[in-house]
Every structure is written in structure tokens, then in C-alpha cells.
Design a protein with these regions (language model features):
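A short, surface-exposed loop/turn module that caps and links secondary-structure elements
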Residues: 34-62
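Enriched for short, Lys/Arg-rich terminal
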Residues: 1-3, 11-26, 44, 59-89
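Short alpha-helical linear motifs
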Residues: 31, 50-53, 69-73
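PIN-domain endoribonuclease scaffold, especially VapC-family toxins
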Residues: 25-37
């Protein structure tokens, strides 16, 4: 089973979401749990392999506006961003 690794400030973003927006936090937890149980490149959140300058990373939908940006190997799922869409400044 894989483990989650929160890179940079993503743990802070996770905790802020948990405190400030319970509904969005619950929506985030569903794909996280799904990725831990099965293939992180499939399942909930419409997984999408990113291209160009984000090549090697994946995206899953949390809401219409928010995304989870991550990559994975056989042991870990690395979380790089939680929140806004990856093409927004």
C-alpha cells in the first residue's frame, strides 16, 4: 500500500481546507482514500496526466474549480498542490 507525502506547503493547505471548508475537505478526502486503495492514475476525480511544463504530474478534480496535483510511484503518492486550477496564476 502506498503512503501520502505532502510536499512544500500542501499540508498547510490541507489543514486550512479542513478548518475553513468542510464540504471541500470531504470532497478532497474521497480521491485521496481512493488513490491509497487502488491505482492513483484511475478512479475518482477524473484523473488526468498533465503535459508540457507539468509533465510527470497528475491532476484529479476536487470541485469544478479545485484540483489535486500529484505524482506517484510504487511506494508513495506525492501531493504537490491542493486547491485552485493548475493553469491559474
Amino acid at each position: 500500500m502506498r503512503s501520502l507525502v505532502f510536499e512544500g506547503n500542501t499540508w498547510i493547505a490541507y489543514e486550512q481546507m479542513r478548518e475553513q471548508d468542510k464540504k471541500l475537505h470531504k470532497a478532497l478526502c474521497k480521491p485521496l482514500k481512493d488513490m491509497l486503495r487502488s491505482d492513483p492514475g484511475a478512479g475518482l476525480g477524473k484523473p488526468e496526466r498533465l503535459k508540457h511544463n507539468l509533465s510527470g504530474l497528475w491532476s484529479k478534480r476536487i470541485s469544478l474549480k479545485d484540483r489535486l496535483i500529484y505524482k506517484f510511484d510504487k511506494n508513495y503518492i506525492y501531493i504537490f498542490a491542493i486547491g485552485g486550477h493548475y493553469d491559474q496564476p
